[in-house]
A protein has these predicted regions:
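Primarily the internal scaffold of c-type cytochrome electron-transfer domains
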Residues: 1-75, 118-140, 144-145, 150-217
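Non-catalytic propeptide/linker segments at domain boundaries
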Residues: 64, 74-78, 82, 98-101, ...
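Aromatic/pi-system hotspot detector in well-structured domains
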Residues: 77-79, 83-87, 109, 147, ...
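Short, flexible, mixed-charge glycine/proline-rich loop motifs
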Residues: 81-101, 131-137, 175-179
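A cross-kingdom signal targeting lumenal/periplasmic-facing segments of multi-pass membrane
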Residues: 90-116, 121
Length: 217
């Protein structure tokens, strides 16, 4: 099997996507296709479109929120780092202590994030300026965000989803393989907020998942 003949034996957190290429060439190829920007549709496509220009009412609805400054429809995972770096939301910090946003904004952009959370601690990772992590967050969303690098099983690499389950009295480690296929996406593709002065990433799910539940929360 491939696990008995791996060319790159990976231990622990591995953020470098290219190290998975030799052992998982087909999966790596499909990942590289997220770099494409060749179609637009009613449901976004893969081209960055200025959503505020298309829907100017969102500037008013998002007033006081960073998305009122700039929001483009998302491109593929391979563009995650360059797109957030170019966004007006993050500004142009000239030093690690400047800029309008916390490093929490990096959370879903790179497999380097779990590496830095392990090195610094989750609280310390969030409680920094966005610019402070720029030299470390260099690999775009990829393999180890959703797969355990040692076993390639689906896994949750971001703490906010695990914590949201815990506050509901649920154990995410009991999720079925079928549920994990959704949950690996749910750790990032969700509504969230940055809690308190520490800008701790939090999902407002304590009372449920609907808009009304979140408003009640």
């Amino acid at each position: 099997s491939i696990f008995n003949n791996r060319k790159n034996v990976i231990k622990g957190i591995e953020a470098r996507n290219e190290l998975f290429k030799d052992d998982f060439p087909r999966e790596y190829q499909t990942w590289t296709e997220t770099a494409k920007t060749d179609f637009e549709s009613e449901f976004n496509g893969n081209i960055a479109v200025d959503a505020l220009e298309k829907r100017p009412e969102m500037v008013v609805l998002w007033a006081g929120y960073a998305f009122s400054k700039d929001y483009s429809t998302p491109r593929g995972h391979m563009h995650a780092i360059e797109d957030i770096t170019a966004s007006l939301r993050t500004g142009s910090p000239m030093s690690p202590t400047e800029g309008p946003q916390p490093s929490t904004c990096w959370t879903c952009k790179s497999p380097d994030v779990p590496r830095m959370m392990e090195a610094l601690g989750v609280d310390s990772f969030y409680n920094n300026k966005w610019g402070a992590m720029g030299a470390e967050i260099v690999n775009p969303i990829g393999c180890s965000d959703c797969h355990d690098p040692e076993t390639m099983n689906l896994h949750i690499s971001r703490p906010a989803l695990i914590e949201a389950f815990q506050r509901q009295g649920k154990d995410i480690t009991k999720a079925t393989p079928q549920e994990m296929r959704s949950l690996v996406c749910a750790q990032c593709h969700v509504e969230y907020y940055f809690k308190g002065d520490g800008k701790y990433l939090t999902f407002p799910w304590d009372k449920g998942f609907t808009v009304e539940d979140m408003e009640a929360y």
